[in-house]
């Protein structure tokens, strides 16, 4: 019998030279073709988050796919964190640095209440920049990030280093 990590690793597809030459892209979309495996993934995240969170925030866009299911199973609200200009007001925004430039994310400022314990979910942890910006956004709203969860951790990019100042509870199901 395979472990969940082995099943995930067998399902994720390496795409060579995407999105640019020299990059090996970890394509998680085949996970969504297997409903049984997807349920196992969601259940694994739920088990790690039980009793620890009041809200699940999903990062646009692949953080929405399992994030909403995690929230539903935990019976807590699901909040979208989106690129700037995609949510109606009132919003709070947070900018962060990219390799070449900046990006900005937003959340509806009414949805994260003071003292809320927040799980931030996304598909892949790379440099940690987006997740770090999300945690700063949660703080601006008065919440506290109590857990991060990712399907994949690209450990060679050291993304966890940017997140441990918010919480050391960082759940990943596999790493490369």
Predicted regions and their residues:
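PRPP-associated nucleotide enzymes
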Residues: 1-176
